[in-house]
């Protein structure tokens, strides 16, 4: 009898967990606040963002402050510059904003400096080096910009908050920024030199634009530092692979194949799993980080898999899926214990940036 009572108490505790996620819908100028509980995900609120009701301003990147009190949103479609907007998680109301660069995209806040680091993707501009904007989120002031590569994306901070990492999609490089010194500390070419030996001269010539600038075959779109080891993992969107980089040696330590068009990557907080969206196939892949074995590929609810947010207890992955045409976006919930899709909810069109907010015990 005692065992039965304990079982029921534990079961009730597990079932009473609730998880909250924010997701941006780029073609609708909305952000949805979602709640996942008892294996069901629901939309609690749909927040209209942007200033001009007749224009699509393109909410792209979204992140929650480490203290959970604020969320930040990049509006990519500016005239010409985009901007960063700060919101309260308590009320989902605007608290401030600042202008950034061309097509501001992904971002994170450092737990050490308190600054927010946002890459300016420059999607529609000429293929030349762009920047990382460094913002004081208290005053919402852009402190400085740091020049990196062409079409930088995937801005992520090291677990200790001392370094910011991003990849340049068109120049095929990994950049490490000193979060305290506010300058590029190291740059790594991600191209596979072994492949280059076998490609034709015509293919190599095609890697350069008319102005002589390199066009990457790897086309990296995301980087995520390992939470416990000095490693980072990069999505090779053009080369259909994940690239592992040893941050101590500052060199590529491994490559493994994926489906077509890996886009975003995240690592579970317990450091056991690597999750990747396979954008061109509308799938989500799960790998064991211990041996890099593919554990499961899961078909998403609709097409164009995009972003990933993982719960703080490493039990669930929340996947934003853009959809095509006039379809609504979708957020899929995947169990990281049995590798199955367990719930989905419709949000605004072209669901993209996604961020985990909090977990609560009811």
Regions found by a protein language model. Give the residues of each.
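Sec-dependent N-terminal signal peptides
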Residues: 3-13
């Amino acid at each position: 009898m005692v065992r039965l009572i304990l079982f029921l108490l534990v079961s009730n505790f597990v079932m009473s967990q609730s998880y909250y996620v924010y997701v941006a819908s780029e073609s609708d100028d909305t952000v949805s606040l979602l709640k996942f509980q008892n294996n069901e995900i629901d939309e609690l609120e749909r927040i209209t963002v942007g200033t001009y009701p007749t224009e699509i301003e393109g909410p792209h990147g979204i992140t929650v402050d480490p203290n959970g009190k604020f969320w930040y949103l990049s509006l990519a479609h500016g005239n010409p510059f985009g901007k960063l907007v700060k919101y309260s998680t308590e009320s989902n109301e605007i608290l401030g904003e600042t202008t950034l660069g061309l097509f501001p995209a992904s971002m994170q806040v450092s737990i050490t400096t308190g600054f927010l680091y946002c890459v300016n993707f420059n999607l529609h501009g000429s293929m030349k080096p762009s920047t990382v904007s460094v913002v004081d989120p208290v005053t919402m002031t852009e402190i400085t910009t740091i020049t990196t590569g062409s079409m930088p994306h995937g801005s992520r901070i090291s677990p200790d908050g001392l370094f910011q990492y991003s990849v340049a999609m068109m120049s095929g490089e990994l950049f490490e920024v000193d979060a305290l010194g506010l300058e590029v500390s190291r740059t790594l070419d991600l191209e596979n030199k072994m492949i280059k030996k076998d490609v034709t001269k015509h293919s190599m010539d095609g890697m350069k634009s008319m102005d002589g600038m390199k066009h990457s075959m790897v086309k990296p779109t995301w980087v995520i530092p390992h939470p416990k080891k000095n490693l980072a993992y990069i999505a090779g969107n053009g080369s259909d692979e994940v690239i592992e980089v040893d941050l101590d040696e500052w060199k590529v330590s491994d490559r493994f194949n994926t489906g077509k068009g890996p886009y975003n990557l995240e690592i579970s907080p317990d450091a056991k799993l690597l999750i990747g969206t396979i954008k061109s196939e509308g799938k989500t892949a799960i790998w064991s980080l211990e041996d890099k074995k593919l554990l499961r590929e899961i078909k998403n609810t609709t097409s164009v898999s995009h972003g990933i947010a993982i719960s703080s207890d490493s039990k669930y992955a929340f996947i934003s899926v853009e959809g095509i045409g006039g379809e609504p976006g979708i957020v899929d919930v995947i169990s990281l214990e049995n590798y199955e899709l367990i719930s989905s909810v419709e949000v605004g069109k072209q669901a993209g940036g996604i961020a985990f907010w909090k977990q609560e015990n009811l």
